């Protein structure tokens, strides 16, 4: 089967950056004139919040540049750091739980993450061998 990129459509949910503008706390939905834009790449801002030059600058920015500016805010960086910290803590907790299940001498020996994974592979292989015999 041949795939043609012209006819292939992907049914993917929109990403966070495509569904929310950097100004989502400015009132959401419709723009200042009461009509929402159908283009997800257009950022809508109240005219009272930006000066004339600010509005012109924002309109001419590409979607990528608006995304970069939004990610540069302290609020975004703090939220991202919090999410990353939670992810790393969950990751480390999973390694600690796996480590408790591995028989080693001495039992309290500190192992790196790669050592934990390699020992887990060996131990699972050993248990499979024991079951096969």
Swiss-Prot record:
Positions with biased composition (Basic and acidic residues): 52-65
Q: Does the keyword Lipid metabolism apply?
A: no
Record's Gene3D superfamilies? Answer: Helix-loop-helix DNA-binding domain (4.10.280.10)
Domain of life of the organism in this record?
A: Eukaryota
- A cellular-component GO term for this protein: nucleus
Q: Where is the composition biased (Gly residues)?
A: 25-39
A GO term (biological process) for this protein? Answer: cell differentiation
Q: Which Pfam families match?
A: HLH (PF00010)
Bias regions of kind Basic residues — which residues? 66-78
Task: Give all residue intervals belonging to the bHLH domain.
Answer: 75-127
Q: Which keywords does UniProt give here?
A: Developmental protein, Differentiation, DNA-binding, Nucleus, Transcription, Transcription regulation
Molecular-function GO terms, alphabetical? DNA-binding transcription activator activity, RNA polymerase II-specific; protein dimerization activity; RNA polymerase II transcription regulatory region sequence-specific DNA binding
Q: What is its main location?
A: nucleus
Q: Where is this region: Disordered?
A: 1-78
Summarizing the function annotation, the protein's role is: May serve as DNA-binding protein and may be involved in the control of cell-type determination, possibly within the developing nervous system.
Assembly and interaction partners: Efficient DNA binding requires dimerization with another bHLH protein.
Q: What is this protein called?
A: Helix-loop-helix protein 1
Q: Which organism is it from?
A: Mus musculus (Mouse)
């Amino acid at each position: 089967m041949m795939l043609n990129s012209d006819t292939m459509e992907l049914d993917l949910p929109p990403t966070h950056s495509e569904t929310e503008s950097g100004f989502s706390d400015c009132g959401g939905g419709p723009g200042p004139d009461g009509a929402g834009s159908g283009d997800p790449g257009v950022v809508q801002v109240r005219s009272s919040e930006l000066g004339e030059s600010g509005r012109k600058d924002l309109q001419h920015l590409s979607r990528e540049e608006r995304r970069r500016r939004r990610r540069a805010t302290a609020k975004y960086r703090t939220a991202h750091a919090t999410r990353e910290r939670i992810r790393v803590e969950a990751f480390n907790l999973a390694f600690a739980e796996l480590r408790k299940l591995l028989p080693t001498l001495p039992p309290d020996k500190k192992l790196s993450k790669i050592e934990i994974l390699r020992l887990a592979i060996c131990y699972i292989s050993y248990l499979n061998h024991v079951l096969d015999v």
